[in-house]
């Protein structure tokens, strides 16, 4: 049978301005309305608001719209305190007051746990911090604009690869913020600006760290300018050249003091961005676990020992397990640095069966997990076999927490406590802590 060419149907987007009423926020912080019974997502809109929107995307099951005007504002709406907020992709909830942000995140956490884990529970008090000056590390993008012959230093625009030039970031730790104007001036005079990659700034307790990603070796003139800048500002300087190799140039090795333990780290290592929330989080985790001096504790996804070392001060022995070998070595160094002798660290792929591993032969009544966004799939199924009676799960992704909760519930655990950790104020990013206790 002959086939005749049929042109694809092109649906035209109705771009006229349309009024809608926002019903609630979705889990990413966008306003949710309904247009012709179809879900419509509007960034920057708040529940209860009547707004004017223009469609930007219209799919079969949902649509997206640009906020044109707020016709009837919410009582929770506030003026953003950052001059870059309208363009920058870093924060997405500065238009919502602080109490509203916390309420939204708690509600989102509760809804996800009910939907995917079937668990409804009154939340513990949220763990919060100051909402400005809290970020002790940040990565800033660099791009040389050939047309304007100017360097762009800042953060990515919302839903774009373009860069918003930033000379002041209110959520950045003040001593890091102070570096931005002079750092921009320094790099704007770079001999080969097209080779600039990105900049990382980290605030340790003993030093500020500057990491420059550069494509290829630096010419002598640029190297001298950079080291002079680091010396004048008393910075620890690292270069990241080909293949992600980290090269220490000058300055003392950084460390941070966390709940009575000193954690040495490299800029390539993970440390929590919000120091205040991290410290409260560690204290809460230890309180929820209720560790006694006769118990062995297992810390999974242990990193540099953020939880492991404080746990070791309460337990008979602690085992920390981490997937990255370099982190294991550094965690071992941190234990020695703090003169803690009842802890051992191991490298392992925690997606695999660990029940036959040497460290798993002696059981653990108390277990703490702090996985990455992918969650603890694999090891979470083995917690009963490892002897766990009480489990604290620290999560940076409520969706994978809800998924992994199903495994724990099927093993005979019950959800005892649940709380929100506001690690990133003014963003929709949600972290949480859950306590599971074995029935009987």
Curated annotation (Swiss-Prot):
Amino-acid positions noted as binding S-adenosyl-L-methionine in the UniProt annotation, renumbered to this chain: 272, 301, 306, 322, 349, 370
Residues the record marks as active site? 396
Xref: Pfam families = TRAM, tRNA_U5-meth_tr
Keyword annotations:
4Fe-4S, Iron, Iron-sulfur, Metal-binding, Methyltransferase, rRNA processing, S-adenosyl-L-methionine, Transferase
Which residues does the UniProt record annotate as the domain TRAM?
11-69
- Which residues are recorded as binding [4Fe-4S] cluster? 82, 88, 91, 169
Quote the InterPro entries the UniProt record gives: 23S_rRNA_MeTrfase_RlmD, MeTrfase_TrmA_AS, MeTrfase_TrmA_CS, NA-bd_OB-fold, SAM-dependent_MTases_sf, TRAM_dom, U5_MeTrfase_fam
Q: Which GO terms describe its molecular function?
A: 4 iron, 4 sulfur cluster binding; iron ion binding; RNA binding; rRNA (uridine-C5-)-methyltransferase activity
| Record EC number | 2.1.1.190
Q: Which reaction does it catalyse?
A: uridine(1939) in 23S rRNA + S-adenosyl-L-methionine = 5-methyluridine(1939) in 23S rRNA + S-adenosyl-L-homocysteine + H(+)
Q: One biological process GO term for this chain?
A: rRNA base methylation
| Taxonomic superkingdom | Bacteria
Question: What family does this chain come from, according to its entry?
Answer: Belongs to the class I-like SAM-binding methyltransferase superfamily. RNA M5U methyltransferase family. RlmD subfamily.
Functional summary from the UniProt entry = Catalyzes the formation of 5-methyl-uridine at position 1939 (m5U1939) in 23S rRNA.
Task: List, alphabetically, the HAMAP family matched.
Answer: 23SrRNA_methyltr_RlmD (MF_01010)
Provide the protein name: 23S rRNA (uracil(1939)-C(5))-methyltransferase RlmD
Organism for this UniProt entry: Vibrio cholerae serotype O1 (strain ATCC 39315 / El Tor Inaba N16961)
Q: Which gene underlies this protein?
A: rlmD
């Amino acid at each position: 049978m002959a086939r005749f060419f049929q042109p694809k149907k092109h649906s035209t987007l109705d771009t006229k301005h349309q009024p809608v009423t926002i019903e609630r926020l979705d889990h990413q912080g966008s306003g949710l309305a309904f247009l012709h019974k179809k879900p419509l997502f509007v960034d920057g809109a708040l529940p209860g608001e009547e707004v004017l929107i223009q469609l930007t995307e219209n799919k079969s099951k949902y649509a997206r719209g640009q906020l044109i005007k707020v016709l009837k504002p919410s009582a929770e709406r506030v003026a953003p305190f950052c001059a870059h907020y309208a363009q920058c992709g870093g924060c997405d909830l500065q238009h919502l007051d602080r109490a509203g942000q916390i309420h939204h995140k708690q509600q989102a956490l509760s809804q996800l746990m009910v939907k995917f884990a079937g668990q409804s529970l009154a939340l513990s008090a949220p763990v919060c911090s100051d909402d400005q000056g809290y970020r002790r590390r940040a990565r800033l993008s660099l791009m040389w604009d050939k047309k304007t012959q100017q360097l762009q230093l800042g953060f990515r625009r919302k839903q774009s690869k373009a860069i918003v030039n930033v000379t002041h970031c209110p959520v950045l730790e003040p001593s890091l913020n102070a570096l931005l104007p002079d750092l921009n001036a320094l790099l704007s005079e770079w001999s080969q600006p097209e080779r600039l990659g990105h900049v990382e700034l980290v605030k340790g307790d003993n030093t500020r760290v500057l990491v420059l990603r550069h494509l290829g070796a630096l010419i002598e003139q640029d190297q001298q300018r950079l080291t002079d800048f680091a010396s004048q500002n008393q910075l620890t300087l690292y270069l990241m050249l080909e293949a992600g190799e980290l090269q220490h140039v000058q300055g003392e090795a950084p460390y941070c003091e966390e709940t009575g333990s000193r954690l040495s780290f490299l800029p390539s290592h993970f440390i929590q961005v919000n120091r205040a929330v991290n410290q409260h989080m560690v204290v809460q985790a230890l309180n929820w676990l209720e560790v006694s001096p006769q118990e062995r504790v297992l810390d999974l996804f242990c990193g540099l020992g953020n939880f492991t070392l404080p746990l070791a001060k309460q337990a008979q022995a602690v085992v920390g397990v981490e997937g990255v070998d370099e982190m294991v070595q550094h965690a071992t160094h941190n234990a020695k640095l703090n003169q803690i002798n009842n802890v051992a660290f191991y490298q392992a792929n925690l997606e695999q069966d660990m029940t036959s591993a040497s460290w798993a032969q002696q059981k653990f009544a108390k277990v703490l997990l702090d996985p990455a966004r992918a969650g603890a799939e694999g090891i979470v199924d083995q917690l009963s076999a490892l002897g766990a009676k009480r489990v604290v799960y620290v999560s940076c992704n409520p969706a994978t927490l809800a998924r992994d909760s199903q495994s724990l519930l099927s093993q005979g655990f019950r959800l005892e406590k649940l709380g929100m950790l506001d690690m990133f104020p003014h963003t929709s990013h949600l972290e949480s802590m859950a306590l599971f206790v074995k029935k009987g």
